[in-house]
């Protein structure tokens, strides 16, 4: 079998971190004996510059045919038209592929807790996953309008939309430490009242999982004061967007956090959670670990290569533990150095 992978380098540092990761994929495929082919497509701001839109039909159709999609990063201050922004391409891609699940793990690597802005004793041993609903909620709700006197956004969820994301979260929790935290604002939001009701109903199907509920403001506090208490967190789109960015700083850098977005079937999208960082683009100083860890998720979930994923992750964790990092993590290596060291480790 030959896996079909679509590569979307995007904008800013996206091309340099994705292209380096693809060089690692070539080494890994030879070592673990599997075949793949890559289709490169412009996406986001780069696509706007070339084609006048952030996501062309050609690119979308290629993504629909793919086994996996690897995305570098998109966006930047260059693209200011509110009706034609790079981010709109990503929203359209998620909606078109029905990528309703977003998985964002946060892990504090052994021996690297000193990198966190929080006290070491608070973060050491943190290993949590945020499961974010990705295609509904206030980012997609209708009606919406804006003028100089009034603005309206609609936060809408159906029972079916809540059920499907909650089932994913329960199954993930059951495969880990058996604890699920559901985040809402049930005391004031109608959508959260339905959310909590559905979570409680679905919980009856997963007796092996312990469930607790937290208001989103309380959860944001507990993520900082005691992140080790969490196993799996499930939340709606807006809350998940905010909480996952908050959680990403716990290990010490946005550059350490991967993510995967998927549906019940079809291709999965893998990307680091950081932005395109146009201020450092092309300077060979970007931290590529988030992109490489996203590749590891792709190896495990879409390419059926769990051993390769484990090896890649362990090499990264070892590098971080021994201070072989870029400047944002206190190290002295550049982007190319990271890929060269990992290439040597994988070839060993």
Curated annotation (Swiss-Prot):
Cell membrane is among the record's keywords: no
Amino acids binding substrate: 94, 104, 132, 217
Known cofactor(s): Mg(2+); Mn(2+)
SUPFAM superfamilies membership: Isocitrate/Isopropylmalate dehydrogenase-like (SSF53659)
Residues marked Important for catalysis (site): 139, 185
UniProt: Mg(2+) binding residues: 217, 241, 245
Record: residues binding NAD(+): 76-87, 275-287
Gene3D superfamilies: Isopropylmalate Dehydrogenase
Matching NCBIfam families: leuB (TIGR00169)
PANTHER family: 3-ISOPROPYLMALATE DEHYDROGENASE
UniProt name for this protein: 3-isopropylmalate dehydrogenase
Organism for this UniProt entry: Staphylococcus aureus (strain NCTC 8325 / PS 47)
Gene encoding the protein: leuB
